[in-house]
């Protein structure tokens, strides 16, 4: 299984390494200390996360509380703009929250009026119209703090995946799954996180064999790259894509850029060594 490395910028932008389209050749790159380094290929940002529920004050810019985020016309327009600025991949952060759904679920109540199109359907249809690819979320079973140690939470995410596969598995915009198992990579990824990811992945392979599967763990700022278990845990994962959160803009690390390039190099070496 080939795992591609993605980088998330400011928690919601995705550097999509699987895009072989437009690339820019740079004549020189500037290092963090201001000196010029060897020429490097620049990959454009070609994907973004979509955040439907307003969860707390951290969403005030990406998802203003005063907007109706369930309005299908809003998302039709947004997706068109995303395509215009070069987005090819859309990732649902979640399609349910606090046991209400943003799609026509039979498992829970709807978070939008039943007389109009769901926001998930609006986004999927607009994405198909513009030739874009969508990663469908399997959360939240409850909320953004879903604990996959809880069998009920993991079971509900699998139920949601089954329902979503039935609704969107054959949709022309459906490309894969985003598993919201956002566990911490520091110091190493936990056993329970690996097991939860692989359990969800196994079900996803049964439902949609050709779909790509992505996770987005956090915490590389305090990862113990020298611990042999760090590499071993990555090798155990059965996903296709790891979208590492660089956490720029977060409060976990005051100056994340100072170590970011070095961290990416270490991760690249680990992935090359394991061959995944």
What label would you give each PLM region?
Residues 1-5:
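Positively charged n-region of N-terminal signal peptides that target proteins for export
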Residues 30-276:
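Glycan-processing catalytic domains of CAZymes
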Residues 15-17:
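C-terminal motif of bacterial Sec signal peptides marking the signal peptidase cleavage site
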Residues 6-11:
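Sec-dependent N-terminal signal peptides
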Residues 19-21:
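Bacterial signal peptide processing site
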């Amino acid at each position: 299984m080939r795992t591609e490395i993605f980088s998330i910028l400011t928690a919601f932008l995705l550097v999509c390494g699987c895009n072989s389209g437009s690339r820019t050749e740079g004549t020189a790159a500037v290092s963090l200390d201001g000196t010029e380094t060897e020429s490097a290929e620049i990959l454009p940002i070609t994907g973004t996360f979509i955040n439907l529920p307003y969860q707390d004050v951290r969403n005030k810019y990406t998802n203003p509380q005063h907007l109706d985020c369930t309005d299908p016309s809003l998302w039709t327009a947004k997706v068109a703009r995303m395509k215009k600025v070069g987005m090819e991949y859309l990732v649902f952060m979640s399609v349910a929250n606090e046991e209400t759904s943003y799609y026509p679920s039979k498992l829970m109540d709807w978070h939008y009026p039943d007389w109009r199109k769901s926001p998930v359907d609006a986004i999927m249809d607009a994405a198909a119209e513009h030739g874009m690819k969508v990663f469908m979320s399997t959360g939240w079973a409850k909320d953004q703090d879903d604990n996959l140690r809880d069998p009920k939470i993991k079971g509900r995410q699998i139920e949601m995946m089954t329902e979503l596969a039935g609704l969107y598995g054959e949709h022309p915009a459906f490309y894969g799954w985003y598993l919201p198992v956002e566990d911490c990579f520091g110091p190493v990824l936990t056993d329970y996180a690996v097991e939860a990811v692989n359990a969800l992945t196994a079900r996803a392979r049964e439902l949609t064999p050709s779909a790509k599967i992505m996770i987005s763990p956090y915490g590389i700022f305090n990862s113990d790259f020298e611990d042999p278990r760090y590499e071993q845990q990555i090798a155990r994962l059965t996903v296709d894509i790891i979208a590492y959160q660089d956490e720029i803009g977060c409060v976990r690390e005051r100056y994340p850029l100072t170590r970011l390039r070095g961290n990416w190099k270490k991760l690249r070496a680990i992935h090359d060594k394991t061959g995944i």
